[in-house]
Amino acid sequence: MISIVADLESITKLESGELKINLVNFDLVRLTEEVFELAQMLANERGISLQFATKTEKPIMVSADKKRIMEVMNNLVGNGIKYGKKRGFVKVGFYDLHETILIEITDNGIGMDKNDLFRIFERFYRVDKSRSREQGGTGLGLSIVKHIIEAHDQTINVKSVPDKGTTFTFTLGKAK
């Protein structure tokens, strides 16, 4: 119940523009390692590997609200685990687009039908009601993710194929 109230409070502030974005420079690789550390136990329980899709030998510095981007990454990696297949994967890749970094989170889970893709960022929308009930959650996570990315003046995109998996992509500005 507390989680639902916190999610509703977050999304209300995001939608109204009340939530301020606190831009700081941070290492996206390190933040993703922290997300993987937090998610590892659940991933192990479900037989899902957490991987980097690109080389991460050096820091990738971005300018963004670190707390909010941690929330975005936790949500997207968590969903990849939650809706993943046994012996599946969640991969995070980073791609340099000159002034921005493209972040790509891919899983080989249950995927979504193209008709659902238009609605997944809506409040309380759940693709598969029976599976969602089994997995828990508030139905607010992807709506919050979208608002956080938009508050950074960026967009989030999704591609998915049923029974093949899902890929979310968004960009963040490089640290100056």
What are these model-derived regions, one by one?
Residues 16-21, 59-64:
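Conserved micro-motifs of the catalytic ATP-binding
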Residues 112-126, 146:
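Short conserved segment of the HATPase_c
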Residues 153-154:
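Conserved glycine-rich
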Residues 42-53:
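Short conserved segments within the C-terminal catalytic ATPase subdomain
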Residues 22-37, 51:
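A conserved beta-strand-to-alpha-helix junction within the catalytic ATP-binding
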Residues 87-99:
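Short beta-strand/loop element within the Bergerat-fold HATPase_c
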